[in-house]
């Protein structure tokens, strides 16, 4: 937040939230500057404030020989009174003539540094602190302050980099206030002023003031996809805008924390669509979870609603545009309070930021618990979604959900420190640039998720130790297996197998029952060297059975509730699924409360390992197509091959496993969900893997088979580009594979980013068809995405185009050789049912496969990668 003020030669105070301050704002400020009586009128207009006593309240009037009292009643100490804070080889004190029209006496003096100077403050209590820096470049005979260029740094953060007031301001003679919110973890806080070579640094006043810990919680919501975001306390913030929507200017003495709130009119895109509403501040009642320190009653007592929302077409949004820096992430705090409804549960609306849905179907009655009850929401907007302006919009829901209206009471826009802990520019305190940063938003989210997992694990350990004595009886592995499928699968008992185990085995069709000793022997007593995978359930080991068969042994961790839940789900799913392109369950073990599942061993491991990261021989384009086709068959079977469709919910390249012949099989059904007959979605908490998650699933928390389609689209791009879905080490625009690849696709230059190993080997038409399939999978809305059957059809066609291309090149090569007749040679007919007619290797005539019918039960040859798939795989399984 910047505050500009003019003394005698600079006559007005301007709060610089944009380049065009409104007339209402200027009038309110002039009232404030006119004297105590006017201030009292302004205070009465906005109402009383709830006080907060900061542990640290350091106010310095730099360059002053005596203390100064500001119009809001605060006292700033002089240089002599604060000499213990400053470390400087030399400094120059300058002043301007006194004037009754100066906004505040702190702008009449300044301190100038020609070399680096440091203020060191000993804090009473570490934690969140406001840091406010005041600047005004008034004329003096020592130095032209308008040309001063300098940086301001803390031990960890860059607050200002090569700051020059004439560049920062449309009016270089106006005062500027920079406001920051920093979480100080040490008892000492250092503030360094570093002038540029042959220049100087200056400062008029400094504030270091404690802020309440609850002002910034550690968690919020990330935008697009909408997902929980943790770690907000790890950032520093610059207050850029603080807006009282639909209300007047609120001066510091009328705010609960001495903040300034400006009116919203200069940011409102179309005033004709907005209507101001208000109530008395005393009508605002804070719920227990919202402290009055978040925002005063006067913010929540005013709002903007949709103009004429009851009489005109309500299908419009009210928009506010805020100039911003697209190089930074932003924390947007939105304030809501339902002061327009006459009854509960009558107002539902959507909130959008930069065109993306930030909050869908906001029901203030539910989240706030009452009418006139404050509620706020923190939204983190990644720099990849930023432009020169930040846009906030409110609008009604597009369905019959009560009154067609939407409201907003307040907006705060805070710039977040970047990957090198800078709030201004790309250089960190240690000279690193953002290009060298080791973490960004995605990496931070990943770290926080891992940290949360450790916290959850600790809670589970505590719960495990406190378990009742009869826990084992009530929670044996077999006890929670539900008799889902009374199949007729044959089974074998192991040596010493119990009747109880055989009963569950035959009921569930789980295959062979293994004793614990058998699996210990098979895995060398679960030796660490045998681990081939790790998940929330526990470890996966490679094992060798008595007959030499290699298996994958998944051993559950009883201390992980997530693992138990996923085990239950996986057993329920696998007990009724049999398909060539789904990993098969061989058997299980529940001895001594163990939770162990035994699967067929996939010797070539995850698909991802063959694309990047493992230095394995690169796959050909045909091999990649066949693997994608096999995976698509498996997913299509899940969606349509059972009475109840199944949504995998965690489709990714590590969950597509390859056997010794590179046949693809979909694995890991721990997050899968059944879809009841007649339903097209499942309302459920958002789960999955970052980078693959369906954005619509995030927004609506409604899981559909199109969520799998979206994730599979990301897998297709991995196959084409041979890089991870998310890579935080890359430049910002390349972090997300789906977004990056689609940008190149729209430019018609996708071939520029494909795996270099594929260069010159792909038929352009095959790649075009493949890329079109991926693009359709990645549509924002599920209704616009194809079914897995449609995806499979397109992949089959891409494969046929590639095979025709390859055959055409082979024929050209053969025709270029001299004719040689080999005695006894006999022409061999092509066993493939497709005989492409190749005119040239540029354009091969390929029969288009018949469209896949979603519920076709006719079997075709699943073993041939060259067969023309006019019908679908046997959905009855085998």
From Swiss-Prot:
The active site is at residue 650. This is Probable receptor-like protein kinase At4g39110. The chain crosses the membrane at residues 441-461. Its EC number is 2.7.11.-. It comes from Arabidopsis thaliana (Mouse-ear cress). Glycans are attached at residues 170, 183, 254, 317, 382. Belongs to the protein kinase superfamily. Ser/Thr protein kinase family. The lineage of its organism: Eukaryota, Viridiplantae, Streptophyta, Embryophyta, Tracheophyta. Residues 808-844 are annotated as: Disordered. It is a single-pass membrane protein.
